[in-house]
A protein has these predicted regions:
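Short, highly selective alpha-helical patches that border small-molecule cofactor pockets
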Residues: 16-20, 103
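Short gly/pro-enriched beta-turn/loop segments at secondary-structure junctions
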Residues: 98-101, 148-150
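Alpha-helix N-cap/loop-to-helix initiation residues
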Residues: 12-13, 77
Length: 203
């Protein structure tokens, strides 16, 4: 069983099942997916996304045992998450090869500040405290931002309003400004909701 924790926010709840669907669609092993929101963990809604520090709650939520994957909610999996899990290393917080940690494979024996203290720290402060554990080895194919490339294994829509606009405008919401990455997202939305939005009924 691969444990996957996703930093999320109430504003983006329509995308949670889309990401979850994309993970399960490609996974060759059982997965346990937990969507974390600030209010679920008793934390402040802070930072540009509201969930920046939630990644550092993962070890505590796992009882400081085993390993887990962290993802942001504005992502879409195009490959087997077991491949991503294979980058894990004992005693390491494995992050992207450019040093960013929006995708991470975490040894949960590592102890960031506890939940009750997370609001007292900026994200960069916690990351600095964990620097000795950070291992930047996950290749760029696991974080292709705002575009589509043939070798992409994970798409990252850094403008979260793309997702919100999908439901505000209706599907296909990208019709006035199509890109290949948006078309891929739209296809997964249609698949994950059975071709109907969460508040729509078949005609």
């Amino acid at each position: 069983m691969i444990r996957v924790f996703v930093g999320s926010h109430a504003r983006w709840d329509e995308h949670e099942p889309v990401l979850g669907y994309s993970i399960r669609k490609h996974s060759t092993v059982p997965v346990d997916i937990v969507f974390m929101r600030p209010e679920y963990l008793g934390l402040d809604d802070a930072g540009c996304t509201g969930f920046s520090n939630l990644r550092y709650a993962v070890p505590e939520l796992c009882g400081y045992r085993g390993s887990a994957i962290y993802l942001d909610c504005d992502m879409l999996l195009l490959a087997d998450i077991a491949e991503l899990a294979a980058y894990g290393k004992p005693g390491k917080w494995v992050v992207l090869d450019d040093g960013t940690d929006e995708v991470a494979v975490i040894d949960c024996s590592i102890r960031p500040p506890p939940l009750e203290e997370l609001d007292q720290h900026k994200k960069h402060e916690i990351k600095t405290k964990l620097a000795e554990y950070m291992e930047p080895v996950i290749p760029a194919e696991w974080n292709v931002e705002d575009t589509f490339l043939p070798w992409a294994k994970l798409l990252h829509f850094t403008n979260l309003y793309f997702v919100e606009d999908c439901w505000r405008r209706g599907v296909p919401w990208y019709s006035n400004h199509p890109t290949e990455s948006q078309e891929v997202l739209n296809r997964y939305i249609l698949e994950s909701y059975g071709q109907f939005g969460p508040d729509q009924e078949p005609s």
